[in-house]
């Protein structure tokens, strides 16, 4: 049997360029063979010109089979050699338009995870971070050429010390919907944010101005890498939509979307030298108590009494962090931290929707607080007026066992 090798066609070179991006998404990819079946959706997003650029690489290799330098150097070696050529469209799976000329160029910043570190000149609670979310008219199936249909974007500036410092919000005009998937978009919208898929008067089609305002809001001074945070489950969608918006705007995308769960763990690490588990942090962010709070949703969603809003999702991340970490860092809660800080301060600390992460400190509080005492005399003062405390049976065990013991005792006494 002949030794079959992967055909070095246009798709082969695209899969080669996609390897770093696939690894960034958490996929275990060791080579092109494993990357090939994972790149079909991203390949469908490329324009005809971009696909032609990869086809040209394949033709060059076919004409000169001994020349293997075009792919052996990997993504970054090829990128360095062709940095000045406008015909090089490799972009680690995504592409961007240059702000000065309307032609596709390579991505200037390779996809990578950024180490979360706080400014040494500032306390961690003074660190300013940005929470972002972008909603779509559903998650398009693999048959669709477009992965998402962006419709709403929001970003919140936040510090633990000061609370929410500002917000950015806009509705995105998705343009022409993918042909044949209008019903899919309609269903996705109706089941979540309910933003109209067409004819929406608030939808903004000035992509350049929208993206420029977002960049000015997050990073007024130029910066090669700008970290923004969202929930781990939303990272791929938000990152894809940012790339799409940057392409429409004709600008470079310097945003790097990071997990807000990692940021929260970093806050605990710096203060307590301990870190909660990731599932615990995920549960911390999974709350519904502020869905209908005032000044949380955008005006359109609030006027229409809808809780699923991109701006609200960003603000609720800030609320969760404020409520969990305020006591750890000794921060006084204000209306910039929570919609109703007085109520949050006075409510019972054992809230089923709030996860207590510092278990040792909570146990110390419980042992010293009479509310959690096992002594009935101490606990009776906390019973509602007019209600007698429940005097349970002295016996232990399951109810069925006590019932059997009672029946056996009654039979013995009657016998």
From Swiss-Prot:
Signal peptide limits: none
GO BP annotations, alphabetical order: cell differentiation; meiotic cell cycle; piRNA processing; regulation of miRNA-mediated gene silencing; regulatory ncRNA-mediated gene silencing; spermatogenesis
Presence of the UniProt keyword tRNA processing in the record: no
Residue ranges of the region described as Disordered: 367-399
GO annotations of cellular component type: cytoplasm; nucleus; P granule; piP-body
Membrane-traversing stretches: none
Composition-biased stretches (Basic and acidic residues): 372-386
DNA-binding region in chain numbering: 4-73
Entries under InterPro entries matching the protein: HMG_box_dom (IPR009071), HMG_box_dom_sf (IPR036910), Maelstrom (IPR024970), Protein_maelstrom (IPR039259)
Gene3D superfamilies registered for this protein in UniProt: High mobility group box domain
Molecular function terms from GO: DNA binding
UniProt-annotated location(s): Cytoplasm; Nucleus
Disulfide bonds, paired cysteine numbers: none
Pfam families according to UniProt: HMG_box_2 (PF09011), Maelstrom (PF13017)
Entry superkingdom: Eukaryota
Keywords in alphabetical order: Cytoplasm, Developmental protein, Differentiation, DNA-binding, Meiosis, Nucleus, RNA-mediated gene silencing, Spermatogenesis
Family under the similarity heading: Belongs to the maelstrom family.
Biological role: Plays a central role during spermatogenesis by repressing transposable elements and preventing their mobilization, which is essential for the germline integrity. Acts via the piRNA metabolic process, which mediates the repression of transposable elements during meiosis by forming complexes composed of piRNAs and Piwi proteins and governs the methylation and subsequent repression of transposons. Its association with piP-bodies suggests a participation in the secondary piRNAs metabolic process. Required for the localization of germ-cell factors to the meiotic nuage.
Protein name from the UniProt record: Protein maelstrom homolog
Species per Swiss-Prot/TrEMBL record: Xenopus tropicalis
Name of the encoding gene: mael
């Amino acid at each position: 049997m002949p030794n079959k090798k992967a055909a070095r066609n246009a798709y082969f070179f695209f899969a080669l360029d996609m390897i770093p991006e696939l690894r960034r998404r958490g996929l275990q990819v060791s080579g092109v063979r494993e990357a090939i079946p994972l790149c079909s959706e991203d390949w469908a997003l490329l324009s005809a010109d971009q696909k032609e650029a990869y086809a040209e690489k394949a033709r060059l290799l076919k004409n000169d089979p001994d020349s293997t330098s075009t792919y052996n150097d990997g993504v970054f070696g090829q990128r360095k050699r062709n940095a000045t050529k406008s015909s090089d469209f490799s972009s680690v799976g995504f592409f961007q338009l240059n702000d000065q000329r309307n032609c596709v160029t390579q991505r200037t910043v390779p996809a990578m995870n950024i180490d979360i570190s706080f400014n040494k000149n500032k306390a961690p609670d003074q660190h300013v971070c940005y929470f972002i979310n972008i909603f779509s008219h559903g998650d398009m199936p693999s048959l669709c050429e477009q992965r998402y249909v962006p419709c709403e974007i929001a970003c919140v500036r936040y510090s633990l010390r000061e609370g929410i410092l500002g917000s950015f919000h806009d509705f995105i005009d998705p343009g022409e919907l993918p042909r044949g998937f209008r019903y899919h978009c309609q269903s996705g919208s109706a089941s979540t944010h309910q933003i109209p898929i067409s004819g929406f008067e608030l939808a903004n089609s000035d992509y350049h101005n929208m993206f420029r305002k977002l960049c000015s809001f997050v990073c007024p001074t130029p910066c090669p890498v700008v970290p923004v945070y969202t929930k781990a489950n939303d990272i791929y969608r938000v990152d894809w939509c940012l790339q799409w918006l940057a392409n429409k705007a004709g600008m470079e995308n310097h945003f790097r979307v990071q997990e807000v769960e990692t940021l929260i763990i970093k806050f605990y690490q710096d203060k307590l030298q301990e870190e909660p588990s990731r599932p615990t942090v995920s549960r911390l962010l999974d709350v519904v108590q502020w869905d209908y709070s005032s000044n949380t949703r955008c005006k359109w969603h609030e006027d229409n009494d809808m809780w699923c809003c991109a701006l609200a999702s960003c603000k609720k991340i800030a609320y969760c962090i404020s409520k969990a970490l305020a006591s750890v860092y000794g921060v006084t809660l204000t209306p910039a931290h929570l919609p109703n800080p007085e109520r949050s301060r006075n409510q019972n600390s054992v809230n089923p929707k709030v996860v207590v992460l510092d278990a040792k400190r909570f146990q110390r509080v419980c042992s010293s607080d009479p509310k959690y005492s096992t002594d009935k005399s101490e606990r009776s003062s906390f019973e509602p007026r007019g209600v007698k405390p429940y005097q349970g049976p002295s016996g232990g065990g399951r109810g069925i066992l006590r019932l059997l013991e009672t029946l056996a005792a009654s039979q013995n006494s009657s016998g």
